[in-house]
Amino acid sequence: MNLEVVAQLTALAFIVLSGPLVIALLAFRKGNL
């Protein structure tokens, strides 16, 4: 695998993982307030 493919997969994984994480964080903060 070359570096471009690895970088794209890393970026994609980051976006896919950060989506639900941000939603969970917002829900948690909203629940606290």
UniProtKB/Swiss-Prot annotation:
Compartment(s) where it occurs, according to its Swiss-Prot or TrEMBL record: Plastid, Chloroplast thylakoid membrane
UniProt topology in membrane: Single-pass membrane protein
HAMAP family found in the cross-reference section: PSII_Psb30_Ycf12 (MF_01329)
Major localisation: plastid
Name this protein carries in UniProt: Photosystem II reaction center protein Psb30
Pfam families in the record: PSII_Ycf12
Complexes and interactors: PSII is composed of 1 copy each of membrane proteins PsbA, PsbB, PsbC, PsbD, PsbE, PsbF, PsbH, PsbI, PsbJ, PsbK, PsbL, PsbM, PsbT, PsbX, PsbY, PsbZ, Psb30/Ycf12, peripheral proteins of the oxygen-evolving complex and a large number of cofactors. It forms dimeric complexes.
GO cellular component, one term: photosystem II
Positions of transmembrane segments: 8-28
The species this protein was found in: Staurastrum punctulatum
Keywords: Chloroplast, Membrane, Photosynthesis, Photosystem II, Plastid, Thylakoid, Transmembrane, Transmembrane helix
Top-level taxon: Eukaryota
Family designation: Belongs to the Psb30/Ycf12 family.
Record's function text: A core subunit of photosystem II (PSII), probably helps stabilize the reaction center.
